[in-house]
Amino acid sequence: TLDHLRHVAVQTNKEWAERLGVQQSTAITCVKPSGTVSQLVDSASGIHARHSQHYIRTVRGDNKDPITQFMADQGIPAEPCVMKPDTTMVFSFPIQSPKNAVTRNDMTAIEQLEMWLIYQRHWCEHKPSVTITVKDEEWMEVGAFVYKHFDEMSGVSFLPHSDHTYQQAPYQECTKEEYKELLKKLPKKIDWEKLSSYEQEDNTIGMQTLACSGDVCEIVDLT
């Protein structure tokens, strides 16, 4: 089925590229939603399962970023980053997965890898990225899988299944009671109209990148 769907997608792109007189896209198929979009729409990311039924999602913010100060002033639970306490703030958001959602606790590391391999072989024209959570007793089996499929392994990261390995990890499993307690600490309403008062200067200049090839960079003057 995935092979057929990929073929239809590629052929449709080819047909419309010819009609419009443009080049055919290099890659058509991919896995969505992306990590960022999944946070905005409250869904699992790509081919990943949900972290757990209840978990805390931490987000880091640069202290120089206006939205970091804005969020702190609005009362969103925050604490200094343990690695960079002077420059970075860590915000915590309680998340509840939908009822009957598949979580990482429902899948073994090998099942996660096998799903990734199916989409790589039969759907994606590029290498889909995935983070595999591995229990202590699964590492040897995972190592054997990587060795067997070594020539296909790309875009795969591994993390210990335990949440206690890293402080302030991006995803931290919690109980239903802990979820409810943190939920009470969130502000009932965020006044986004006040954000503009924090943005008194352009902080994006340093983050801009130029499209460069060789010794030439493309700069478009929009003024």
Stretches found by the model and what they are:
Residues 1-32:
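Internal maturation/activation junctions in enzymes
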Residues 203-223:
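Short acidic, low-complexity intrinsically disordered linear motifs used
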Residues 26, 39-40:
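Short capping micro-motif at the N-terminus of alpha-helices
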Residues 6, 18, 33, 40-206:
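Catalytic alpha/beta core of large soluble enzyme barrels
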